[in-house]
Amino acid sequence: FLPLLLAGLPKLLCLFFKKC
């Protein structure tokens, strides 16, 4: 579960700040 959360966080930040 934790690895999934850590993998999903960068994607969420990418969407919010639009810096992919």
Curated annotation (Swiss-Prot):
Disulfide bonds join 14-20. Pfam families: Antimicrobial_1. GO terms for biological process: defense response to bacterium; killing of cells of another organism. InterPro entries: Antimicrobial_frog_1 (IPR012520). It comes from the Eukaryota. Keywords: Amphibian defense peptide, Antibiotic, Antimicrobial, Cytolysis, Disulfide bond, Hemolysis, Secreted. The keyword Disulfide bond applies. It is found in: Secreted. Expressed by the skin glands. One of its GO terms (cellular component) is extracellular region. Antimicrobial peptide. Has low activity against the Gram-positive bacterium S.aureus and the Gram-negative bacterium E.coli (MIC<15 uM). Has a strong hemolytic activity. Belongs to the frog skin active peptide (FSAP) family. Brevinin subfamily. This is Brevinin-1DYc. It comes from Rana dybowskii (Dybovsky's frog).
